[in-house]
UniProtKB/Swiss-Prot annotation:
Assigned protein family: Belongs to the ATPase epsilon chain family.
Coiled coil: none
Function of the molecule: Produces ATP from ADP in the presence of a proton gradient across the membrane.
UniProt source species: Desulfitobacterium hafniense (strain DSM 10664 / DCB-2)
Pfam families attached to this UniProt entry: ATP-synt_DE, ATP-synt_DE_N
Protein name listed in UniProt: ATP synthase epsilon chain
Keywords: ATP synthesis, Cell membrane, CF(1), Hydrogen ion transport, Ion transport, Membrane, Transport
Stored HAMAP family: ATP_synth_epsil_bac
Record note on quaternary structure: F-type ATPases have 2 components, CF(1) - the catalytic core - and CF(0) - the membrane proton channel. CF(1) has five subunits: alpha(3), beta(3), gamma(1), delta(1), epsilon(1). CF(0) has three main subunits: a, b and c.
Record membrane topology: Peripheral membrane protein
SUPFAM superfamilies: Epsilon subunit of F1F0-ATP synthase C-terminal domain, Epsilon subunit of F1F0-ATP synthase N-terminal domain
Length: 132
């Protein structure tokens, strides 16, 4: 696993990350997408989940609510709907959001079920990004 590639994560709020990474794993629609240096060109959507990447042998995490990834010329650019590095996640707030979404899903009456499911998925992604 010699070498690195440039990893950029951009969200509507601005640049979230620019690092020389050794490996990145993205939440894809049909499972995880793993990218190493010199990966073949690729454009794909990503789903709600956790982006895991390795820099200098250390694994870091970013919670995302989806977006797109482009791989080209040893550069990986992630255009994320939202992107929150794990160390910035307010874990108590994420746990409370998870609890609210679970409560809504048990009631089911008078709620938008899909919206509650997505809120639960986002909360779980934030929790997973914050935890080691």
């Amino acid at each position: 696993m010699a070498g690195t590639f440039t990893l950029r994560v951009v969200s509507p709020e601005g640049n979230v990350l620019k690092e020389e990474a050794e490996f990145v794993v993205l939440p894809g629609g049909n499972g995880e997408i793993g990218i190493l240096p010199n990966h073949a060109p690729l454009i794909s959507s990503i789903e709600i989940g956790v982006i895991r990447y390795t820099v200098n042998g250390k694994v870091e995490k970013i919670a995302t609510s989806g977006g797109f990834v482009e791989v080209s010329d040893n550069k990986v650019t992630i255009l994320a709907d939202t992107a929150e590095p794990g160390e910035r996640v307010d874990l108590d707030r994420a746990l409370a959001a998870k609890e609210r979404a679970e409560k809504r899903l048990t009631q089911r009456e008078g709620i938008d079920v899909r919206r509650a499911e997505l809120a639960l998925m986002r909360a779980v992604a934030r929790i997973n990004a914050a935890r080691n």
